[in-house]
């Protein structure tokens, strides 16, 4: 097999699925799949970034999930159609797995248990995200994001600040104001590529 497959994926998939892995490169802006289309592949993001997005009745795009590494389309595994669009926000590479073969492989106990464990971790991540979205003010949402998604008080940005605003459910103008306020209060330091909490213990 001449394509690169991350160790996490090699450890998860049975040999029958590993043999069917296909590498797919994507530029920024490309749609990996479309809302309403019948699922054909499961996607595992190896590099770059993609988001799950759905447009509301008012024409506003909502980011449902941001993926910088891992599976992107778990919710569509057993459905008749994709429930959203998958859009690349940074160019990269994905592993595409035929969805029918993926479904068939779940009949094997070892793989099905590994898949359940992976989904359990994803549920925990979504609960953390829901907790963050439930916070009332933007500063609290931003601090929560850095504390839960960053490392040692530093959140490295994988895209731009406009994408970050969508991730926490606010406008980018409101995000910039919140960052400016936190910087003025000496709580946070902003750089083009990262946000750093200067007083993590005081606000934890």
Predicted regions and their residues:
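Cyclic nucleotide-binding regulatory module and flanking cytosolic helices
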Residues: 1-28, 67-72, 77-79
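Phosphate-/nucleic-acid-contacting segments
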Residues: 147-204
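Cyclic-nucleotide recognition modules
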Residues: 63-118
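A short beta-strand-loop-beta hairpin characteristic of the jelly-roll/cupin
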Residues: 50-62
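Polybasic "coupling" helices that flank or enter modular domains
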Residues: 110-172
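Short phosphate-coordinating micro-motif centered on Lys-Gly-acidic
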Residues: 31-37
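Short, small/polar residue-rich loop motifs at catalytic or cofactor-binding pockets
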Residues: 18-19, 37-39
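Glycine- and acidic-residue-biased ligand/ion/polar-headgroup-sensing regions
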Residues: 40-53, 68-70
């Amino acid at each position: 097999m001449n394509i690169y497959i991350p160790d996490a994926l090699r450890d998860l998939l049975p040999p029958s699925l590993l043999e069917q892995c296909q590498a797919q490169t994507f530029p920024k802006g490309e749609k990996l799949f479309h809302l309403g289309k019948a699922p054909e592949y499961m996607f595992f993001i190896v590099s770059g970034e993609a988001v799950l997005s759905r447009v509301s009745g008012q024409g506003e795009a909502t980011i449902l999930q941001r993926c910088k590494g891992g599976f992107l389309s778990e919710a569509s595994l057993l459905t008749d159609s994709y429930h959203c669009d998958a859009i690349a926000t940074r160019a990269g590479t994905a592993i595409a797995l035929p969805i029918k073969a993926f479904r068939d492989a779940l009949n094997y106990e070892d793989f099905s248990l590994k898949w359940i464990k992976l989904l359990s971790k994803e549920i925990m991540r979504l609960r953390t995200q829901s907790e963050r979205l439930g916070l009332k003010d933007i500063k609290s949402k931003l601090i929560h994001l850095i504390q839960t998604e960053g490392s040692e008080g530093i959140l490295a940005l994988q895209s731009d600040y406009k994408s970050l605003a969508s991730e926490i459910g606010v406008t980018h103008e409101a995000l910039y104001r919140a960052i400016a306020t936190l910087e003025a209060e000496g709580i946070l330091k902003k750089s083009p590529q990262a946000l750093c909490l200067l007083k993590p213990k005081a606000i934890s």
